[in-house]
Structure formats: C-alpha cells, structure tokens
C-alpha cells in the first residue's frame, strides 16, 4: 500500500523530499502547502536546482495545482497549519519542513486538517526523535508527532551505534565540517544571536554550535551525556562530513573497527550506513541516499582505545530520503502500508 503524504513548507528540504519521493515506490506526495510561494514559482523551483540538477520528469501547473508526471498535486497557501485541508487529498501523514512548527503543540495543528501523523524534518525540543537504523523500532502507534532529528545526527548515530555496540564508547567529541545552508549570509550581514554566523558563507570557515552529538543521547540512551560536538561551516554548497573522536572501553585496532563498520554497512544497516576505501572528496557523494558513508582511509587511531573516525553525508539528499523511509516505517507499524 502506498503511503499518501503532504508536505508543509516547500523550501530546501521540502523540495528535496518531494524529489526523493518520485524515486520512492512506497510514497505518494498528494499535497503541498507553502504560503509564500505561488504554484508557478513552486514548479520552477522544483524543476531547476543548482545543486541537484534539473528535475527528471514532467511538471505542469493546472489552475492552482501542480501536475507531476501526470498526477495532480494539490497546492495550498495557508499560513496556519490548522487550516490546511489535508483530508481532501487523503494525506494521512505530513512532513513538516517549514522549520517553524518544530514543537509537538505547533505541529499538532496539522491534525485539525485531517492529517493523522506529523514528521518534523528538523530536531525538536519535545517531540520524540527517531533515526532510521538506530531507534526507529521504539516507535509506537500512539505517537502523533515525531522528529527525524537532524542530518548530522542521522550521520553520526548509525556510526556511533556500531562502535558502541562492538567496543563501548566511554566518551567522545564530534566536529561536523558542514556545507553552508540557507540561514547563512551571501555577504556580511546582521546576525545578533550569532555574530560569526553573519559573515559571508562563501569566503569563510565559520565555527558554529550544533546539538547533533548531544541528540545522539536521545536516540541511543546509553550514550546520553557521553558525546558533544561543534560545527565548522565551510564554503561548499552541499555534502558534509563528521569527524568523531572517541575513547573506547574495549581496545581495538583500526582494522578491527573498519571490519565492524563494513559488516554493519553490508548487513543490518545496508542503505543507511555506507563504507568506502576509495579516495573520495565531498562532491563524489552529492546525491547519495545513505545517511552516513564511513571513510575507511580518512580515520586514524592513536592507540587501541583512542580513535578518530570520519563519515560523509549528503546533508540534503540523504537526510530527505530518511524522512521518507521513516514515514514508510511508521505507516507499516500503524497498519497503513
């Protein structure tokens, strides 16, 4: 059974989720809502993408709706989520990708329009967070609003799970070397809460905060309080990389660590965790659907108990694919797929 989904917010992640859904046989996008974009402009932004190229399909505007590959997608422009008539299209699930309605109470407004469940495509202060391959099996039917966590948490958590399950992480620090995003500036501009964040994105390496490492403690409770991290925003447009430095309880050679990651990537975490010994750089992974691609040749160990691990991720495409995978997973648990 195909899962019918609505998208609220047709920005960066909303559009990339839509593009991924075209490739995902188990998901059908039936409606989109964005109060700041009219349908013709939405069609234009969906068709042309500076990072991922031109949309491979047919896009038309008919009345106020989009027609994608012959299928009608209802297009709404409601500012209040409570006023979006999701029930008109049978959208049982909603992807909340505005970046605005990220708490349980705010996201629950979608239920008034007929949606039954909401997946927030961002970290949430109070909604339960799920990372595919890590803690998705803890989802229960009674949960109405949930979060897919962040792109960085989706990269870090599968790797941390493998290492912790096999060797036990005592403590660790993470740095994500992260491509710039839409919240940053093209030229220097005001940013009262984050002075460095107001500097030109394309010219600077900008230290920044991230809650991604601490969030791992929410999806892997055994690591709660054992990981923290920071971000370096760099002048690349997409694809980021996690640098995880951990102290291990059970000593292991770097080769043993590689073997453990490869076994997980080829086995239970296939499609989520990747493994490569190729001499790759960031652009090689543009459009990669996996959450985390372990770079076997980039890591180093000081000794058997202290190691630095490196794992790549397409912070747009891979994350958006996991949003859909999470939707399909919860639909199966709910009995709707």
Swiss-Prot record:
Domain of life, per lineage: Eukaryota
Binding site for D-glyceraldehyde 3-phosphate: 150-152, 181, 210-211, 233
One Pfam assignment: Gp_dh_N
Catalytic activity: D-glyceraldehyde 3-phosphate + phosphate + NAD(+) = (2R)-3-phospho-glyceroyl phosphate + NADH + H(+)
Single GO term (MF): NADP binding
Top EC class for this record: oxidoreductase
Record-listed E.C. numbers: 1.2.1.12
GO biological process, one term: glucose metabolic process
Keywords tagged on the record: Cytoplasm, Glycolysis, NAD, Oxidoreductase
Cellular component, GO annotation: cytosol
Residue(s) at site: Activates thiol group during catalysis: 178
Pathway named in the protein's UniProt entry: Carbohydrate degradation; glycolysis; pyruvate from D-glyceraldehyde 3-phosphate: step 1/5
Positions with a binding annotation for NAD(+): 12-13, 34, 79, 315
Subunit structure: Homotetramer.
Family of this protein: Belongs to the glyceraldehyde-3-phosphate dehydrogenase family.
Name listed for the protein in its UniProt record: Glyceraldehyde-3-phosphate dehydrogenase
Source species of the chain: Phaeosphaeria nodorum (strain SN15 / ATCC MYA-4574 / FGSC 10173)
């Amino acid at each position: 059974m195909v899962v019918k989904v609505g998208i609220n917010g047709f920005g960066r992640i909303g559009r990339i989720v839509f593009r991924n859904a075209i490739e995902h046989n188990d998901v059908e996008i039936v409606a989109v809502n964005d109060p700041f974009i009219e349908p013709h402009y939405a069609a234009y932004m969906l068709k042309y993408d500076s990072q991922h190229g031109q949309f491979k399909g047919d896009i038309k505007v008919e009345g106020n709706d989009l027609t994608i590959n012959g299928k009608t997608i209802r297009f709404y422009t409601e500012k209040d989520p409570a006023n979006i008539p999701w029930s008109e299209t049978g959208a049982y699930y909603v992807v909340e990708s505005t970046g605005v309605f990220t708490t349980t109470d705010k996201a629950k407004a979608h239920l008034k329009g007929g949606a039954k469940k909401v997946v927030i495509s961002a970290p949430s202060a109070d909604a339960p967070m799920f990372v595919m391959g890590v803690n998705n099996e803890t989802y229960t039917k009674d949960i109405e609003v949930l979060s897919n966590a962040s792109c960085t948490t989706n990269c870090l958590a599968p790797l941390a799970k493998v290492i912790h399950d096999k060797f036990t992480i005592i403590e660790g620090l993470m740095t994500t070397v992260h491509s710039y995003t839409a919240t940053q500036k093209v030229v220097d501009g005001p940013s009262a809460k984050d002075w460095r964040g107001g500097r030109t994105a394309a010219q600077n390496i900008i230290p920044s905060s991230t809650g991604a490492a601490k969030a791992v403690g929410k999806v892997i409770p055994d690591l709660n309080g054992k990981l923290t991290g920071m971000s370096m925003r760099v002048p690349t447009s997409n694809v980021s990389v996690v640098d995880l430095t951990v102290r291990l309880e059970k000593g292991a050679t770097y080769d043993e660590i590689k073997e453990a990651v490869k076994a997980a990537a080829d086995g239970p975490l296939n499609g989520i965790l990747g493994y490569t010994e190729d001499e790759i750089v960031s652009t090689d992974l543009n459009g990669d659907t996996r959450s985390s691609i372990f770079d076997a040749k980039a890591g180093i160990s000081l000794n058997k108990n202290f190691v630095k691990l490196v794992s790549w991720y397409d912070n747009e495409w891979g994350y958006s694919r996991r949003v859909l995978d999470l939707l399909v997973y919860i639909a199966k648990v709910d009995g709707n797929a």
